[in-house]
Each structure stands twice: as structure tokens, then as C-alpha cells.
Amino acid sequence: MQQIDIQEKKIDRALFQFVFPFSLKQGTESSISLFLNKSGFKLFQLNQLEDECAYYGDFKVSHRDMEAYYLSFTNKILFPHSEKEKGLHRYSKPLNIRGKLITDTECIPFQIHSVDLTTCPYELGFLTIRTELKPFTSVPLSHSLEFADRFRVLEPRTQKDNSTKIECDGKIYKGAGEFVFNNLFEGLSRFFEGDSKENSYFETFSFFEDERMYVQSLVALEKNEKIDVVDVYRMGSLCGLTVEGKPYVHANNLPYIQDYLQKHAYQRWAPSTYFLIEEHIFTCITIQDERTTPDLANQFYGEFYYGLVLNLFHKIVLLKLANTYTELNIEKDVKEMEKLIYSINSFTANYFSLEIVSQSRSRDIFYLLRKNFNIELLYKEAKQSLESLFRYQENVNAKKDSLLLLILTLYSVVGQMLGMGLVVNDFIGRIKWRNILAYNPVEYFALILAASGVIISLILGIQSLYQWIIDQRNRKKWVKQTVLSSTKE
């Protein structure tokens, strides 16, 4: 089949946010908050308007627009007023450092404006690296795609990955993973689930392909350029440069590309602006405009970023719940089953809603994200799992109650038939030991039956009290894991 002819385009600005989800070690929520404060991170809050220009390079992000975009229920989750409130707690740190991504054929300069760490319930977290290509001369679109494709790789797997190096502050790092965890987030990996990189905290979420970061991008082409469908497809698939340094696209069928865009692209403002959403990328490509580009950047860093993080949070939690359900041994893991029931209910009550966005503007983009992440399907499966667990728990409890009722009924009936009052009278006041020694076999049986009934009642009472205490402790632990992500319960 004939190769598609690629017409190289020049970019004016290229903004990237690389997002990496990770699993926190259990019980480290308080210590990671202290670590971040000591490392120069600051809790992000909407009422701190001075931060509107602090983390985004030349652009300003309106806190008022972010708050207005979401419903009040969602705002409480995304923008908690303090570390003690439930929700997603974002800690930001301005950097404004420059570096170079070096390949066998290219050297691509970039600037990192800031980094975020967001701690979440369910022992989750997100790293965000806010990056921009700021060339001194015009840079081809293929270079920005190659940069994103290589920078997102945290754990090299291929020859292409191993040939990538990053130069920053006079040091050369072997790939993005070493740069991220030995420079940008130095010392953070000790809070990750997994004791070492060999053990690897990267294995926590297997649905993220090859340990790569999610890419959110905004690319503005120069004013005299035009966007075609091949450019949009290359943005979504990160088709940058071949090993020879030439632009490429891994599709030769133009109707296939058009069909792909029908499924994954949002073309309301075409042909000047396209949005495209995939499982690994959320991208916008537009033509540079003095008015449009700042508005898109405001959304890119603001409501679109939080929409992405919220949907990633929903997806990961639902996948974790589904994974826990598949590994559950309901005959043995009774406590794990109760914890799973609580976790699903807590997620529904505290963090999930079908209506999240308050404004019709760009609402379609948010729900396109949900559709591509299969949020509704995952949530439906979680509810089905919950119903199945409830039915099983009801059956087990019904059997236990029936058995207990049978035992108590037998004691009551047999005791009345034997006339326990005859032996009980000998224990009122001073115990009549002579009478006890003179009992016949039937009276001894009645005595043993009465004594065992008292003992069983005491055991059941003590066991119930002990179980109540354990349940309260477990509940506090579950609340801390699923409702709060900070220091206090």
C-alpha cells in the first residue's frame, strides 16, 4: 500500500504534562506530607490567587474558572481546603529548569516549569511534570512528538528507550526514569509500594503500558500552518521520528485514520483546533493565535488537567477494587470481603457521581475522557461485585443465625423438659453440696446442661464484644485508607 505523504509542520508552542500514577505504602500519608513540605512543595489551594502564575511558565490559570467548571460536590474532592479534609491533595513546586533530551539523531531542548505530587485516598498518588518546548528557532512537529514519546518512558525496555539520555544541570541521566526519580522527585521512591526499583513500584498498575507516563499535551502550530488529519493521528499515536531521524506515521490507510478520528477525536472547532483522547494521551493541536492559545492553556492546565486526574483516579480505584474481588477467597478472607464492601460503598458515597461538570462548555471533552477510560463499565462491574458480596454475606449470616437459634432452642426445650428448676434451687443462696452429690443421672445431665448454657452465653458475649472492638479498629483503618488521605481521621 502506498505510504502516506507527511507534510512536516512547524510548532510555535508545545506544552506537556506527564502524569504517573503510583501506589503509596500503607500508613505513609502523614510522613509523605512532611517530606513534601520540607522539599519545597506547597499545598495547592484555590484561595491562593498568587499561584495563578506560579507554575505554568508564561501562562496564567484562573482559579475561579477551575472552581466554576465543576459542581460543588466535585470541588470538595478536587480542591480540599486543608490537608485534614477528604479529597485529592495537590502539592506543587516551581522549578523553571532547562534540559535537553538527547537521542542518536536529535537534541531537543525543553523547560520544566513545575512538578506536582497529588496524594489521594485508597493509597494512591500522582506525579505530574509540567514541561514545555521553548525553541529559539522553529521546531518541527515531529520533534515534539518524539520528545513526548521518549520522555514518558520511565523504565527502558527497547533499544530506542536505552538510547535516550537527558542532560540537566550539567548531569546526564540514562533515560527519563533516572531523571525523574533522582532529580525531580529525589527521595520520593521510598514511599512507593515496593522496596526497590528492582522490586519495582512500576508494577503496581499493570494497565499502564510498559511503565510509561500518561501524556497531556497542547501543541500550537505556527500561524501559517494548516492541520490535516494525519497530524491529528500522529499526535494521538505519538509518531515522531524513525531511527534515521525522519518523520513517520504507523498507518498507511487514510480511511482508517479518518475512522480512528471519528472514534477518538473531538472536532467541534475543526479545522483550526482538534482534541484527541486515548488511553495513554489527551492532546490538543491548534493554530497559534494570540487570544485562543492563552485560553486553551488556561483550560489545559486547569479544568482539563483536573478532569484527567479525576478520571484516572476513578479508573485506578475501580480497577483495584476489581482486582481485589478476583483475588478474594470468600471462604477464608472474611475481613477482606468486609473491607472490599466498605471500599466500594465509600467510593460511591464520597468520590463518584454521574454528574460532575457544571458548565456545558467543554463538557463533551470531559465525558469523552470517561468514555475512553471505560469508567461507566468499570463502575457497573464494581456495583455488580458489591451486590454479589452482599448476597453471599446475607446467606452466611443467615446460616449462622439459624445455627445459633437452633442451639438456643435446643437448650431451652431440653431444659424445660428436664425441669432445670429442680437443680437450680440447690444453687440459690448457700450451695447445697450434699444434695448435688446425691443427684441421679438425669439431674446430673440437667446440671451439666445448665452450666454449659451459662458458659456458652458468656463465651458468645465476650466474643461479640471482642469482635465489636476489632471491627471498630478495622473501620478506622479503612476510613483512613478510603476516605482521608492526610494526617487525621
Give the ranges of each region predicted by the language model:
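Membrane-associated alpha-helical segments
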Residues: F300-Y301, Y306-G429, W433
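N-terminal pre-transmembrane cytosolic regions of membrane proteins
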Residues: M1-L221, K476-E489
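Hydrophobic alpha-helical transmembrane segments and their immediately adjacent juxtamembrane loops
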Residues: D5-D12, F16-F18, E381-E489
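Extended hydrophobic/Leu-rich segments
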Residues: V249-N253, I257-L261, I344-N350, Q359, ...
